[in-house]
Amino acid sequence: MEFRTGDIDGVIWRPLKKYHDPRGWLCELFRHDELSAEFHPVMAYISMTEPGVARGPHEHIDQSDCFCFLGPSNFKVYLWDARKASPTHGARQTDVVGIDKPMLLVIPPGVVHAYKNVGAEQGIVFNCPNRLYKGWNRKGWIPGQGVDEIRHEDDAASRFQLD
């Protein structure tokens, strides 16, 4: 399948605002009154990615990710709409976010996603997904089935390629 460049239905791109004062800055990552209930986080984690390194591409069957890119580096985000019933099926979308463009990004199930640290220093990403990693008590998102993740990064012949 050949992907075409375009916006992807259901993906939320929300600029994050840093409020600066003499002490530093503060940024609200999410608020329940500004995020649809279907995307309300149930856990949160932070990851650090080395310069030039990518995470993904992968997708989820049931989980939506709510990523926050604030810096101190920049990331190129890659999205592919693999949902057959989606009005934007076959679309590919990219953008650079992070220190130069702080962004909250909600990615619904079935949208393949990856990000690559394109800056010169280590980059931090927050994720506040709407499902628990490995399910309740880490017993599997469907008991006995491990993690809700299809890892395309493990397939060298994957159609989801980063540039």
Where are these regions (language model features)?
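Beta-rich strand-turn-strand
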Residues: K101-V106, V111-G119
